[in-house]
Amino acid sequence: THGAGNFSIWPNKFMSYGKNQRMLGPQSGSMGFGLPAALAAKVHDPSRFVLCFAGDGDFQMNGNEMGTALQAGLNPVILIINNASYGTIRMHQEREYPTRVSGTAIVNPDYMAIAAAYGFHGERVTETGQFADAYQRACDSPTGAIVEIVTSTEAISPRTTITALRAAAGK
């Protein structure tokens, strides 16, 4: 599952889905859709592995649903892509109003503390080489997990960077 934001381009563009696999995402661009959708998927079929992709701003829209997951005994694996930004809005501002970027930087909570507070496994990934092992441990966790993937705002989407947007705008 995933919510809305530039982070969702990555799984939609680069993940392969098998015959019995599905990706649930919002058709209306709703931030915060991914975690509730992941929980609904687990309720529908508790035996299935459920993976939720969430941007940092996206997760903060409905992160309180971690309580629902705990209460209902659900165990999704949540990948939080943390670029400390509302990335889609930032991308549009850089492209359309390059000298007036405003209100897109965000301060995030300690996602590992949130994972611990709800009894979930938690890991923070800051280098690409750390991901595979962290992801495997998350998948193996019987309690569900949060894997926070710290990225640069510079890599605003798979198609462009902040630097490229500014260069195109002549700034």
Sequence positions of predicted segments:
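Glycine/aspartate-rich loop-and-adjacent alpha/beta segment that forms the canonical ThDP
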Residues: 113, 128-171
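Conserved thiamine diphosphate
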Residues: 47-134
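Active-site diphosphate/adenylate-binding microenvironment
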Residues: 1-42, 47
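Glycine-centered short loops/turns at secondary-structure junctions
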Residues: 46-47, 73, 119, 142
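Short gly/pro/ser/thr-enriched loop/turn and capping motifs at secondary-structure boundaries
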Residues: 8-9, 30-32, 59-60, 84-88, ...
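Short acidic, glycine/serine/threonine-rich loops at helix termini
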Residues: 10-15, 36, 63-65, 88-93, ...
